């Protein structure tokens, strides 16, 4: 700042949201390589009144793309240029400047917010602070965390936005984009066509409804920029226009204007009712109304959402860089719980998840440049080539340990078994190495206690993203995870527990001395808890003593007991069934397809069949030695039970043969291809095509031809869909069913003679049901 005198005014409150108002580059020794950014902060003072505050920061060039795959390829001048384009377009233009370079905008959004947090000093949105504002410049200089504030549990004040804007977009333009990029989401294709050609229908109606704790407005427009034909409520009850004169660096004076909410700082929208285009149409209208009058610097108005990814994304979100300055949250339903989930995600990540994806937690870190690995960890990793044992583990388990002691299908009984799982395992290791990352640590700690379930995908994304962003950190975490697995295995052996299968962050095995006939389920669980505690102590010792890591006791690894079991059956490393016959609790069955509801129903029946097979053996073998005669009797009854199971399943699915949602599968990335032109006439359905597509297979008119894939969710409910090819959906499921039954028959065969085989071809016998 060039101001020679600073006059501070202090005010208590908290930050609700922060958005880039404008940005620029300027010459000078301190900023010649950086990007200057003016932030608008929507704040709430201690009296409960919303107040606008503004802060100027400089994002250094080396910080701009630090955690991006772009590396240092995007200059500060480029960032300033795209921001200028997003604030100087026509007032009726769509805020689609990020289309085609969304990653660059996400990088700008994340790095600028990270810099703002470090410069001002606040911990997070909604945490109580004391604002220090220079009255000479109008700029916020500092925020001092207030640890002793009376109100330390601030939460968002939410309103509800509903909008309907059935915009028509040139079908030929959408088709061209869809054909040009194989597998492009139709939402992306529509936005591309909209940005290039605009609306094909000038009189698109817009219906808007906003509900806040103390206000309600509704407007209905015949076309977007015409006067409303229906109105209810006053916009002044919703927000007001506020102007401020600011003096920026270089003594440059500007006037800014914002929409300041009266009773909300977040608007929630139900994604099943309101499309992103409808929200953008509403905000575009408000933007034009707010800045149609000249005399102020216009803010950036740029949209970031899953529709901007050509392949779509797994999660729904809505983010605008710049205008309107408050937060817009997408919810799966209008229910209170869904809104609570959305606001929790926003509060814990300052709105950076899921919009910035794998980079989100890097932008929440207290540092700019990531700190190096702890010295002892670095030294041990450097010794790997000379240490054969460690080298083998690292080479063979380069994504985490996956191992089993079994070479063929096996069934286990007579001894108690248990399954264990480390809570938030890989993020916990990261936090043990870098305990200064308090924001991540808070979420990891909550996940250890089964809290913040909505952020579990964020943690998974964070760890997976390390492989691309910080590969050395990723390799170090895998190295430590593998060392932990060896430590756990040794500790378990000392406790009389043999690990059978170990998969990354969990394992199951058998207590060698706990007989199921002599020990009850509660006693077995007590033994499992004692084993978990012993493993936790051993792992904590490994991390603290051998690796030299210094972290708080609250962040010590937690090994959770998933269950104790009397019987087990495993047919491959990732396929197993565990059951507690004494308590008759639902079995733990993994390694079976579950992509559709039909698959999940068969999985449930298969799990029940395995329980039945166990009970049959218990009944037949009671007080007898298991021999070939008993095996043959058992196997015959199991085969008969398997027949009854698939017949019951076929009867069940027969009643659902015309129900698309029952058969629906998520399309795999490798299957994605251009959508046929016949889907391009349903614009309102295309706007929802930004997630992995759901498909069903329908019968080919040619009886000898392959089934046809139908993207049924992109069709209106009144569409006539050809008969579902149930047999095509069932074929892989029944194949798995038959294969596992044969593995079961092999697992129980302790004799040299061949096992009985389940030779049925269920589909061949019952295919007539689905013709």
UniProtKB/Swiss-Prot annotation:
GO cellular component: host cell nucleus
Signal peptide as annotated in the record: none
Source organism superkingdom: Viruses
Transmembrane segments: none
Job description of the protein: Component of the helicase/primase complex. Unwinds the DNA at the replication forks and generates single-stranded DNA for both leading and lagging strand synthesis. The primase synthesizes short RNA primers on the lagging strand that the polymerase presumably elongates using dNTPs. The primase-associated factor has no known catalytic activity in the complex and may serve to facilitate the formation of the replisome by directly interacting with the origin-binding protein and the polymerase.
Annotated family: Belongs to the herpesviridae HEPA family.
Name listed for the protein in its UniProt record: DNA helicase/primase complex-associated protein
Record organism: Varicella-zoster virus (strain Oka vaccine) (HHV-3)
Biological classification of the source: Viruses, Duplodnaviria, Heunggongvirae, Peploviricota, Herviviricetes
